[in-house]
C-alpha cells in the first residue's frame, strides 16, 4: 500500500522512526473545524484524490483547495509531515484494521491519533473513531464538530462549498479562517480559467487578489474568470486567485 510523504519546510528531513501524533482526514480547505483536529499533532495523514472522487464520482465533489494550498496551510499550523494516500479502488477495499496496523502504526509510527467525530474509514466505511481504541499502543483523541454562526451549525467543508456556490464569500472565509484561494490558468491578459474540480463562486462581481495584487473580477459558468480592468497576465501561467467578497 504505497503512501506518498511530503515534509514541510518546518519539518524533519527524516522521521527516523520516532513516534508521532497523527491527524487523519480529508482536510479539504483546512477550515476552523479541521484545525481543532490538528491540535497537538505533528503529522497529517490525508488523501489525494479525495475519496469521494472515487467512491461517488457523480456528481463530482468540488474541492476548496488544491494540494499546494493544503500543504501551505498545514505548514503554517505547525505540521511537520504530511502523508498522502493515493486513494483509488484498491485503497477502498483496504480493511479498517489493515489501515490502522499497516499505515497508521507501521508506516507513520503513530502513538496518538486525532480524528473528527464523524470520521469513517476502511472498506465500506466500517472503521470509526472507536476502532482505534482496539490498539493499546494508540491514544485516540476524538474531536466533536465545531459549531459557528447564529444557528450554531457545524463547520464542514460541505457547508463552506454551499456558501461559495451561493457567492457568500465572506461567510466562507469566516469558516475557513483565512482566504478562499484557488489556482487558475491565464488564457489571455485578463481572462482566467479555474478547473472544474474546484468550488467556484456563483457568477458575479468580486473583489479579489491575483498573486497578491488587488483586482476586481467577474466569474462566469464553466470556471471562466475575467478581470474588470486591463491586466498583464502571462498566457498559460498558473496564478492564485483569492476571493475576498462579492460586490454585485
Swiss-Prot record:
Catalyzed chemical reaction(s): riboflavin + ATP = FMN + ADP + H(+); FMN + ATP + H(+) = FAD + diphosphate
Q: What is its EC number?
A: 2.7.1.26, 2.7.7.2
Question: What does the entry give for GO biological process?
Answer: FAD biosynthetic process; FMN biosynthetic process; riboflavin biosynthetic process
Q: In which pathway does it act?
A: Cofactor biosynthesis; FAD biosynthesis; FAD from FMN: step 1/1; Cofactor biosynthesis; FMN biosynthesis; FMN from riboflavin (ATP route): step 1/1
Q: Nucleotide-binding: present as a keyword of the record?
A: yes
For whether the record's keyword set contains Transferase, the answer is: yes
> Which one Pfam family would you cite for this protein?
FAD_syn
Q: Which family does it belong to?
A: Belongs to the RibF family.
Outline what the protein does: Catalyzes the phosphorylation of riboflavin to FMN followed by the adenylation of FMN to FAD.
Record's protein name: Putative bifunctional riboflavin kinase/FMN adenylyltransferase
The source organism is: Rhodococcus opacus
Taxonomy of the source species = Bacteria, Bacillati, Actinomycetota, Actinomycetes, Mycobacteriales
The gene is ribF
Amino acid at each position: 500500500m504505497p503512501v506518498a510523504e511530503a515534509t514541510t519546510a518546518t519539518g524533519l528531513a527524516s522521521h527516523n522512526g520516532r513516534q508521532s501524533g497523527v491527524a487523519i482526514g480529508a482536510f479539504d480547505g483546512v477550515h476552523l473545524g479541521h484545525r481543532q483536529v490538528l491540535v497537538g499533532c505533528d503529522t497529517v495523514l490525508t488523501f489525494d484524490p479525495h475519496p469521494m472522487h472515487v467512491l461517488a464520482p457523480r456528481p463530482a465533489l468540488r474541492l476548496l483547495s488544491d494540494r499546494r494550498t493544503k500543504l501551505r496551510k498545514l505548514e503554517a499550523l505547525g505540521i511537520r509531515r504530511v502523508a498522502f494516500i493515493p486513494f483509488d479502488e484498491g485503497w477502498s477495499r483496504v480493511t479498517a484494521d489493515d489501515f490502522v496496523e499497516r499505515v497508521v502504526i507501521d508506516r507513520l509510527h503513530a502513538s496518538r491519533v486525532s480524528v473528527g467525530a464523524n470520521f469513517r474509514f476502511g472498506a465500506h466505511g466500517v472503521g470509526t473513531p472507536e476502532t482505534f481504541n482496539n490498539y493499546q499502543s494508540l491514544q485516540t483523541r476524538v474531536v466533536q464538530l465545531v459549531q459557528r454562526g447564529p444557528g450554531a451549525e457545524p463547520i464542514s467543508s460541505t457547508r463552506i462549498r454551499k456558501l461559495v456556490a451561493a457567492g457568500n464569500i465572506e461567510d466562507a472565509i469566516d469558516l475557513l479562517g483565512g482566504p478562499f484561494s484557488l489556482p487558475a490558468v491565464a488564457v489571455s491578459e485578463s481572462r482566467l480559467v479555474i478547473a472544474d474540480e474546484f468550488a467556484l463562486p456563483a457568477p458575479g462581481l468580486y473583489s479579489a487578489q491575483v498573486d497578491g495584487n488587488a483586482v476586481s473580477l467577474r466569474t462566469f459558468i464553466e470556471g471562466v474568470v475575467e478581470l474588470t480592468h486591463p491586466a498583464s497576465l502571462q498566457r498559460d501561467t498558473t496564478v492564485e486567485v483569492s476571493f475576498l467578497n462579492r460586490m454585485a
